Amino acid sequence: MTTKLPRWLRSTPRRSFMVYPIVVIGFETARRGGFEVPGAYFLPLLLWGYLEYRLVGIYRQRHNAGSRGLGEMPKRLLQNGPFRLTRNPMYLGHLIFMLGLALSFWSLLGAGIFIVNVVWFHRRVLWDEALIHGEFGSEYDEYRRRVKRWVPYVL
């Protein structure tokens, strides 16, 4: 018998920005015997990651390139704005947020969630790229040659 997760749990943004923080904060609060204020040095990563995800999603919608995520195929290939720096700025926002979560709470559980999601998002990107290549062909090949998959100018 297979059970499907509820739709709200299958949603990547809900997992990244709601479920994982609740799990990490709850786990660390129980492990430490009470809530501790997170390390302020890494809180900007949380804000950066979340805002990157949200603002790039809005940018994508406003430039008629589909909805946030690949719930629907983009109507056109965005190659400007944040997409001129990295091919996956929204997914990168998720990962920056999760890294900030792990570091803010010095959480091994948070680090584990981050590592698992690095692998998951990378596999998801490979799948997305195959779909996008099928839709845009040589235009996407040229874009791939110019723009890195994850970290601008590096990776």
Regions found by a protein language model. Give the residues of each.
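Membrane-anchoring alpha-helices and their flanking helix-loop junctions
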Residues: M1-N80, L92-L155
